Amino acid sequence: MHEEITNRIYRCEGDREVCAGDRATTAPAAVLAGVRWNDDPPFRMAANQSSGSRCKRSETIRFETQPICWATLFEDANRRAARNESFGAGDAILYRTHFGDLQFLHAMASRDGEAASETQAKLMGWFEFSWRASMGEFTLDTRLKDVQIPVVQAAFGHSEWRLLDLYTQGAGGGLRRELKDVAFGSLLHALEDSYAAGHVDREESSGTSRCLAGSIGFAAPGVIREFHAYNHQDHSLHGEADSREAFMRRFQEPGNVVEVGRGLVDARNAGMKWEEVSPLFSCVVAIQRSDAPAGPGDFTAAAP
């Protein structure tokens, strides 16, 4: 679904066959690669992380390259998260992005009970990092521990990772030359997830307020009532809320994700710095109550 939304953001106006699927490339290929990154970031595992798994530790792990390994790790993370284990620095990134401290990559809280203001701050930090990366402020060799953004420091400051290791581990030189587009695609993924009911609970937009930054403006989406956390959700129900049918139900609303995404593409093309464009992001992820606790929403998993 992310590919279709992204192609529509890049002004694909056709039907599903035109705007979705592997052959739909209205958006730049590296942007689409970045959109996929949040769900399937490439990574390698230390010996203590891969014990007992069917993973080739010397090779980059992605769903496409090591599907059995990937699925085994995902199910292990799922079982442990259901027992209220938490994942963070020192754990494999797959555990962290779906069940741990990096759930903000999907516009979600890292745990039930996390205050909306905390999740919002993490998401805004990621938007800042990925926007600045998309504008060429960092290079492949920039070490994440040297990026002075609190969410990046908290997530990756313990490591020697570079942007190369984060975004393009195991990739060829072609994708690495398009680092800026990869980063922008990752930003769009988080934006798109902030419209999915399994990720957030938003008010309906009235269409009367606008998000503005310089010459860029669009109708403001509804404010966020609650961020959800994935740990105790029913995955099938979550998946239904991520479906094309769910997207199309909100596609005509003012401030929808395609309208907002197009505004961000225009802002990037205009060369807007983070300091100039940040009001747009603050508007898009505005929250109703700063202390609203995260939870599974209407997607609670049944008790085992």
Describe these PLM feature segments.
Residues 1-182, 197-304:
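N-terminal, motif-rich segments that launch catalysis or mediate targeting to/interaction with membranes
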Residues 186, 190, 194:
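Catalytic glutamate of the conserved HExxH
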